[in-house]
Amino acid sequence: MWYISFATFFFSALLDNLAAAIVIMAVLRKLVPDRTDRLKYACMVIIAANAGGSWSPIGDVTTILLWVGKNISAMHQISHVFIPALVNMLVPLTIAHFWLFKKGSTLRVLSEEEQGDEYIPEIPNRSRRMIFVIGVLSLALVPVFQMVTNLPPFLGVLLGLVILWFYTDLMYSKLHMHESQKLRISQLLPNIDLATIFFFLGILMAVGALETSGQLGIMSAFLDKHVHEPYLISFVIGALSSCVDNVALVAATMGMYPIVEQAADLSPYAQFFVSDGGFWTFLAYCAVTGGSILIIGSATGVTVMGLEKIDFMYYTKRFSILALIGYCCGAGVYMLLFA
């Protein structure tokens, strides 16, 4: 459980929490044959994936929005959110270890016969490792690409795709394989999830319409008058993300509170809303990890729920309280360190 959780935590930061959860679940299906135990692992993967995605600029759609919008920078987010995110994972993991995994879980290693159907043996191990390294680095180095070139981050991802495409085509040109066995990049393009892309496009267009019509300005003025506590606003937004899509919440928040330009005469309250301000940094933590409180609160949770057929009440009874405790503990650690 600890190895799986830490692997998910760090892979989420490199790949993004949804992709990491899908990869880890594929591994779990081979390692944990008993479904009762695997459901517990799967629920813990959701918490670890969202925690890991919160401290990376490419770890979740919401952190990508904040990073691309220049609300937070990559190094600032990593340095400020890593420890709270780690606490967010460790607290539920520790409780689950003593409460839900008292007898442990029996893991198994696949025999060569079982592994035979899972991959194409003609591809050399060296080439497989190279494909893995290129794929991971093409995502992990996107923030570095953006800082060095000052180009949009998506160009860094496309550059990694081009390199991977070139390498795989070069590799297959040297292998004597039937064309149907060659897993080329061009074969994957028709499988792009356009529905999800249009979903996020619709959210951003709707938020833009609300911002243009002035509704978001009215809401921010109301919160400034009656709440006037940026950390509390971020905390509540995170809690709401457990039942409302966090992308919509963060996009709306970015429309409500435009980035304030740095100046010497800024009030203490306005300083929360500058680039790398406390409000945006805490929001990056809250909006992602808050989605773990309910299994339907994040794309990761919904995906794992579908993969393993996890019942909503199963997660709510066993892991919602753990996720809430971890969420509050991580928020408390952030406040102690940076508030």
Which functions belong to the PLM regions below?
Residues 140-166:
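Flexible hinge motifs at transmembrane-helix junctions and intramembrane kinks/re-entrant loops
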Residues 2-6, 42-43, 78-82, 129-133, ...:
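Hydrophobic alpha-helical transmembrane segments
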Residues 119-133, 181-204, 221-225:
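Membrane-water interface at loop-to-transmembrane-helix junctions
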Residues 35-36, 55-56, 65, 75-123, ...:
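Juxtamembrane and boundary regions of transmembrane helices in multi-pass small-molecule transporters
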